[in-house]
A protein has these predicted regions:
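Active-site loop segments of alpha/beta catalytic cores
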Residues: 1-46, 50-56, 62, 66-76, ...
Length: 330
């Protein structure tokens, strides 16, 4: 993972890392306790559950070949009243991180979502402020940066190897922010966040969904180590992205989340194998889904992605080993 983030040819295989992996229960046959279920437990019950969580998560990582794993994040809501899945309240996420690090040792890099850079916000209040009260948006960007840096420090002290800012700045049609807004509210903060994170000895990763083509060149010059998503559903092509950023960025993801959810294992295998053949020689590629791997993703589909990685993920594998008729992805 470190070699990929430093844009060097990995010594053995292309690393696997997911922005968030939610299919722990399906992959293990056990149960990871998160969110409000964890919050309802007594302190003693929470401590016990977090130890079990760490055991399950790390064992699944080893089974699937992950080089890195993202720890549960802070509370946020997918929609009003709908809590995100991979979250823990308050300081529980830091305690869970500590236990994950103890279980994983130095074999698996621990990654945390620190935040640090604004995301697009489609609320009327935010959109109006962009045009009529930009100082308010700038103050929010300052606060987000300060919070992200403090979080990164805390995770650094607990043994993190990398942090990411989940900062969606585009949708499927293109950038949310205008060029002037990017220059004021986004790009300077990416640079400052990446510089601060590097000063802590951590790698700096940015996640953004959407069609980022218009800003790839400038993002590659911000000091980021990696960009995660390369969103296939938004028409982001990995080879075209690589031509723009060259060796300036490690590219993470690009396996279509929709394909993982609804596709056939054979199609997932073929798409992943083609992606690996295209990118592994760069040494600046991390295999994974274009966004979180949801609980609803069938495990045979995810294991088809892993099977392609086993066949095509090594630097010495240059041929196309399609053994689809006999593959068993269970």
């Amino acid at each position: 993972m470190m070699a990929a983030l430093e844009r060097k040819a990995p010594p053995k295989e292309v690393p696997i890392w997911e922005l968030e992996f939610h299919a722990w229960d399906a992959a293990s046959g056990r149960h990871v306790v998160l969110g409000d279920e964890m919050a309802r437990l007594t302190p003693a019950g929470q401590e016990k559950a977090m130890h079990v969580n760490a055991e399950i998560i790390v064992s699944v990582c080893r089974d699937l070949g992950f080089s890195a794993v993202t720890a549960p994040g802070r509370y946020w809501y997918v929609s009003p009243g709908e809590l995100a899945y991979y979250v823990l309240s308050g300081d529980l996420r830091f305690r869970q991180f500590e236990l994950l690090k103890a279980e994983a040792g130095n074999d698996i890099m621990l990654v945390a979502g620190s935040g640090g850079v604004l995301s697009a916000d489609y609320s009327e209040e935010f959109c109006e402020a962009l045009f009529f009260d930009p100082e308010k948006v700038e103050a929010g960007a300052d606060n987000q940066l300060a919070y992200g840096i403090e979080c990164a420090k805390r995770f650094r002290d607990l043994g993190a190897g990398a942090v990411f800012t989940a900062s969606d700045i585009a949708d499927n049609s293109g950038l949310f922010f205008s060029p002037d807004q990017m220059d004021r509210f986004i790009l300077p903060y990416v640079r400052r966040w990446a510089e601060a994170v590097h000063g802590m000895g951590l790698y700096a990763i940015m996640h953004s969904d959407g069609k980022l083509t218009a800003c790839l060149d400038v993002l590659a010059d911000t000091g980021l180590d990696a960009l995660q998503a390369i969103d296939a559903t938004a028409g982001m092509d990995m080879e075209a992205t690589r031509r723009i950023v060259g060796s300036r960025l490690c590219l993470c993801g690009n396996v279509d989340c929709g394909l993982l959810l609804r596709g056939e294992p054979e199609a997932i295998y073929e798409a992943t194998a083609a992606l690996l053949r295209s990118q592994k020689a760069s040494g600046a590629f991390v295999l994974g889904a274009s966004n979180a791997v949801q609980q609803e993703v069938p495990m045979q589909n995810y294991r088809a992605m892993v099977a392609a990685w086993k066949d095509q993920g090594s630097q010495c594998q240059t041929h196309n080993r399609l053994r689809l008729p006999t593959l068993n992805f269970q």
